[in-house]
Amino acid sequence: MDMTPQTWPEWYDGRHINEVLFCQQFLDKHPMKCVRGRLFTVDGLIEDEGQIGNLILEEISGCLTSGLSKVVANLLASIKLQAYSPPLPIETDRIHVANGTYFMDGSSSTDKSYCNNRLTVSYDPSAPAPKRWLQFLSELLQPEDIPTLQEFLGYCLLPTTKGQKMLMLIGKGGEGKSRIGLVMRSLLGDSMNTTSIQKVESNRFSRADLENKLLMVDDDMDMSALPKTNYIKSIVTSECKMDMERKGVQSYQSQLYVRFLCFGNGALTALHDKSDGFFRRQIVLTTKDRPAGRADDPFLVAKLLREKEGIFLWCLEGLHRLIGNNYQFTVSSKAKENMETVKRSSNNVIEFLQSEGYIRFKADSEASSKAIYEAYTRWCDDNAQKPMSANRVSSELAQNERLYNVEATNNVHVGGKRVRGFMGIEVVNPPPY
């Protein structure tokens, strides 16, 4: 129904909309803040700005009948200008939950304030223990690995990277490990992102998609080796701002605190990065084998979500334990062994250096880099392994001088020549020169 002059809103004069007045009244009715062009309410980031556009349309549709899309776009841009705010603080002393705020000292409040992340789960200290969830985990993981998962999921509730770890859950398939991601989605809502760890490293726009996210889940990890690892390593241990790029927007600096949780049938490996730094950032848990003849419950997720308040308390318990341990995760001997296995399988130089019959570590010995590499290639031939470069073998020894009690030198004498090599190692049965 057409409005009459008597019913026109204050911001409309019959021909034009007073944008300043409209935006003031709109923000009084729908309080928001705009940070770097993105709108936030007390419930966190508004992922779909179409919702705001629809609210604007409802306000103006009684006044205007044409050119609505352009007017809505202009008013939305004006609202963002009037709602400007500097970046919201990253708060690690509290968790913003659906029914208020949980403080890390154990207290809580029903008050809500503007925040980067508001979880979609309520804090209910009287929620019962999540029995079905605990049963599910006992069927999925070894008992000694469950505390690790509990601490990591709790770690994902706070916007911090002090733990400096990413978690991999590795199985043969069909165990149900990806159910964990669905449960976390029910707790974190839009503060969780689902994408590929490969994309994070290779797509320059993908890092911006992780801004203001607590968790990124890769529920079917690509087994191909990463061509680079520098972005992933930087994000896992992020302590300062890094460069963000969005399509059509000038790059800017922002701090990421997203954590990585990956499910797959094998470990994350890299084509060229065999450094300890790459593997040190990972925790690898292996699942139990799927029992033969097990009938999967198609309603399992629904049953787990009915316990989400209890699961949240369970995660909080893990978070408090992690903080009490100075952000050092509880890692079982089996998980440590998993990591060593991954390191050896992705870097056969380690296996060669630990082998017998090719080299020997002796304090009063020396060997040229060439002789060591020839011993390594013989080991590769004998073990059907693809050899890495000579530089990679020398680098592995040089980076682990203390571990192997060797010392790099350019003073190894071979056939009257002085060449590069190592003190403290000898080649067993070297081929004649």
Region roles according to the model:
Residues 206-249:
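Conserved nucleotide-sensing/catalytic segment adjacent to the nucleotide-binding pocket
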Residues 1-122, 388:
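Intein modules and their embedded homing endonuclease domains
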Residues 188-190, 195-204, 226-229, 243-251, ...:
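Positively charged interface segments
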Residues 1-30, 40, 45-48, 125-139, ...:
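Replication-associated primase and helicase/ATPase modules
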Residues 12-21, 185-190, 225-242, 394-395:
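A short, contiguous, amphipathic alpha-helix enriched in charged residues
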